[in-house]
A protein has these predicted regions:
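C-terminal "post-core" interaction segments
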Residues: 1, 5, 9-13, 123-125, ...
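Flexible, low-complexity junctional segments that flank or bridge functional domains
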Residues: 1-187, 194-198, 215, 243, ...
Length: 330
């Protein structure tokens, strides 16, 4: 690598070059990275403060519109979160706990990172709030055994911003009886924006323990990101094109975040994280912008309309769960 000086201009040039040569979505997103260099390069003056430099470099990285891109110093971290702004939230924790789950002491059970319950209509429910929360095979055995007599299963991953891909694979493996192609990954092979390896297939192996055979509804909103996006894709892949659909996604498009993140360092010791390896679904379509639901539900709009009509009961309903009940009762 070129050795850039540890000064504002050197740090700017190093960061620009790392993204230019190693970030994987410049072409897919249609970003003119040379123009970005010109725009921000003229703001970086010798002798500017660390704080000002951090602001300029963060703004430059925001041009990538990628939630996996962060700049970190010892005191600050930049984070792009506009990918979910402008979408309905589609999740209300108060409604979920007050009218569906109840309390931990009397309403739902907890096993590791999973909250679970059997509703009165005999539909099972699992809430998983973060793929960073560990889930072992013993936990999954216990939960699926408890839910085994249910007519169908809801897996609620709304607001789950991701975490560990191992957990995504471990859970998805409970929903297939055979090794299944879930997608493809590519790796950068050179500094050019299109220097990628061939697409390498990714397979999901079935768990050799308890597996769920009935219908499943995944509840998603735009804040489902990274490992959650991966999980939703894996679950979609288990639907067989020539068989009746078994796994449904209800709610909104997920947030994406399919690029495998990688980290590098600037001369001043700041760290930059960025998407390095693109991930595709089993049809070789990009997953970076998120996964469309089978059934779109805008809960925010339904709640607003309920208030307008003076319908108090409507304010106790989670529209995504209610839609899932309909699908699983068919």
């Amino acid at each position: 690598e070129d050795d850039y000086a540890d000064d504002p201009v050197g740090n700017f040039e190093q960061l620009w070059k790392i993204i230019d040569e190693r970030y994987c979505f410049l072409e897919e997103k249609g970003i003119d990275w040379d123009a970005v260099h010109d725009k921000y390069g003229k703001l970086v003056k010798p002798g500017i403060s660390d704080d000002d430099l951090f602001d300029i470099l963060s703004q430059m990285l925001y041009e990538l519109k990628d939630g996996h891109v962060n700049l970190s110093s010892s005191s600050r971290i930049s984070y792009y979160d506009a990918w979910y702004q402008g979408y309905p939230w589609n999740y209300r924790e108060d409604i979920l706990y007050n009218y569906y789950l109840g309390s931990a002491s009397s309403g739902y059970r907890t096993s590791a990172g999973l909250k679970y319950k059997i509703f009165d209509n005999n539909i099972g429910y699992i809430r998983y709030e973060s793929f960073s929360a560990g889930v072992g095979d013993g936990n999954l055995d216990h939960v699926l055994d408890y839910l085994k007599l249910c007519n169908g299963l809801i897996i609620d991953v709304r607001d789950n911003g991701g975490g560990n891909l191992t957990n995504s694979t471990r859970i998805a493996a409970r929903f297939t009886n055979e090794k299944t192609l879930t997608g493809y990954i590519q790796h950068k092979t050179g500094p050019g924006h299109n220097d990628f390896s061939e697409m390498e297939p990714i397979y999901l192996e079935p768990s050799n323990s308890i597996r769920w055979q009935k219908k499943v509804v995944l509840l998603t909103n735009r804040r489902c990101y990274s490992a959650t996006n991966d999980f939703v894709n894996a679950m979609h892949s288990l639907n067989n094109d020539n068989e009746e659909q078994r796994i449904f996604q209800v709610g909104d498009q997920t947030g994406g975040g399919s690029g495998l993140p990688f980290s590098s360092e600037l001369p001043n010791g700041w760290s930059v994280r960025f998407s390095a390896s693109p991930h595709f679904n089993k049809y070789k379509k990009p997953l970076e912008n998120g996964i469309e639901p089978d059934v779109y539900v805008n809960m925010d709009k339904i709640l607003e309309e309920g208030i307008e009509h003076g319908d108090a009961e409507s304010q106790k309903k989670d529209a995504l769960i209610e839609r899932a009940f309909e699908i699983l009762s068919e």
